[in-house]
UniProtKB/Swiss-Prot annotation:
Record localization: Mitochondrion
EC numbers for this chain: 2.5.1.47, 4.4.1.9
The name this protein goes by in its record: Bifunctional L-3-cyanoalanine synthase/cysteine synthase C1, mitochondrial
Disulphide-bridged cysteine pairs: none
Keyword terms of this UniProt record: Amino-acid biosynthesis, Cysteine biosynthesis, Lyase, Mitochondrion, Pyridoxal phosphate, Transferase, Transit peptide
Hydrolase recorded as keyword: no
Mutant lacking the gene: phenotype: Defective in root hair formation and accumulates cyanide in root tissues. No effects on growth.
Binding site for pyridoxal 5'-phosphate: N121, G225, S226, G227, G228, T229, S313
Pfam family, one: PALP
Expressed in which tissues: Mainly expressed in mature rosette leaves. Also detected in roots, young rosette leaves, stems, cauline leaves, and flowers.
Domain of life: Eukaryota
Similarity annotation: Belongs to the cysteine synthase/cystathionine beta-synthase family.
Length: 368
């Protein structure tokens, strides 16, 4: 073993091995060799390997939509946030809110219990972060959220509390606050009111869009859940070019931002039934309404025509973007929207009703 250590230390091509090897083979009051070996990748100085999965967040690709935009006056590109570690855009605010709370010493791994109301994707992202950092986490969520989301959160160790779907996200939020009051050492990230949610999109998502379009983006379209994405990206793009137009998207069946009433809809993650505190209405030209039916239809078309298997809110964003792209006044302009999550997360939802039934009824063929 000592000879191996000496050979590694002599390698001129990897001079920074010395610290790592000394740590690996040292016997001074340290853990077992096996434990040191397991810890080695975290400190290995000469690789491009990420220290942990949280460093995979961000830098998602921007892709033009081609077939679904036939006949449009403008170009439409969609940022593919399902390339994130947990396959949704919510990884960005999840890491930002936890990092912000840790920096302010509001939470401590192994001691604090995180509690958060969610429609699914934020819950998955927070559960992912909690698992890595060692937090207990409890999620409240409407019972209409898909089975895939529940199972995914549980796989990260999250505890789930389902709420009455008729009471929407308002009921889910109320239950979360009840748990916050009754749970010792509990903390809520408060995605609907936490400035870190907006700031991470100003710091990362917005600049990525600006860089990938070489500053040529004319219009940005985004569905409104917590409001963090449209507010943060909107502010950033307007700081670079005040002429960029920003549009929000909400379900037609729950159009409270346009003066309507909250109601049931299928665009999970959007249309929370109230105006979130962090939502910046002033950054937007207007909030476009998209029906659940149109959003579902478009999500299916994106898979069939573009090879992009995305969720229902991504379908809604695309419907709104195409609507703007068909306007003569937008001829030749570049419209950017976001595909917020991966479609596989919705296999048990209405999005795949027909295909799921077809798959369940398939019969095996005989093989000679």
């Amino acid at each position: 073993m000592a000879s191996v250590s000496r050979r590694l230390l002599r390698r001129e091509t990897i001079p920074c091995f010395s610290h790592t090897v000394r740590k690996l083979f040292s016997t001074v009051g340290s853990p077992s060799f096996a434990q040191r070996l397991r810890d080695l990748p975290k400190d290995f100085p000469s690789t491009n390997a990420k220290r942990d999965a949280s460093l995979l967040i961000g830098k998602t690709p921007l892709v033009f939509l081609n077939k679904v935009t036939e006949g449009c006056e403008a170009y439409v590109a969609a940022k593919q946030e399902h390339f994130q570690p947990t396959c949704s855009i919510k990884d960005r605010p999840a890491i930002a809110m936890i990092a912000d709370a840790e920096k302010k010493k509001l939470i401590i791994p192994g001691k604090t219990t995180l509690i958060e109301p969610t429609s699914g994707n934020m819950g998955i992202s927070l559960a992912f972060m909690a698992a890595m950092k060692g937090y207990r986490i409890i999620m409240t969520m409407p019972s209409y959220t898909s089975l895939e989301r529940r199972v995914t959160m549980r796989s990260f160790g999250a505890e789930l509390v389902l709420t009455d779907p008729a009471k929407g996200m308002g009921g889910t939020v109320k239950k979360a606050y009840d748990l916050l009051d009754s749970t010792p050492d509990a903390f809520m990230c408060q995605q609907f009111a936490n400035p870190a949610n907006t700031q991470i999109h100003f710091d990362t998502t917005g600049p990525e869009i600006w860089e990938d379009t070489l500053g040529n983006v004319d219009i940005f379209v985004m569905g409104i859940g917590s409001g963090g994405t449209v507010s943060g990206v909107g502010r950033y793009l307007k700081s670079k070019n005040p002429n960029v137009k920003i549009y929000g998207v909400e379900p037609a069946e729950s159009n409270i931002l346009n003066g309507g009433k909250p109601g049931p809809h299928a665009i999970t993650g959007n249309g929370v039934g109230f105006k979130p505190e962090i939502l910046d209405m002033d950054v937007m030209e207007s909030v476009l309404e998209v029906s659940s039916e149109d959003a579902i239809k478009m999500a299916r078309e994106l898979a069939l025509k573009e090879g992009l298997m995305v969720g229902i809110s991504s379908g809604a964003n695309t419907v709104a973007a195409i609507r703007l792209a068909k306007m003569p006044e937008n001829k030749g302009k570049l419209i950017v929207t976001i595909h917020a999550s991966f479609g596989e997360r919705y296999l048990s939802s209405v999005l795949f009703d027909e295909l799921r039934k077809e798959a369940e009824e398939m019969k095996p063929v005989s093989v000679d």
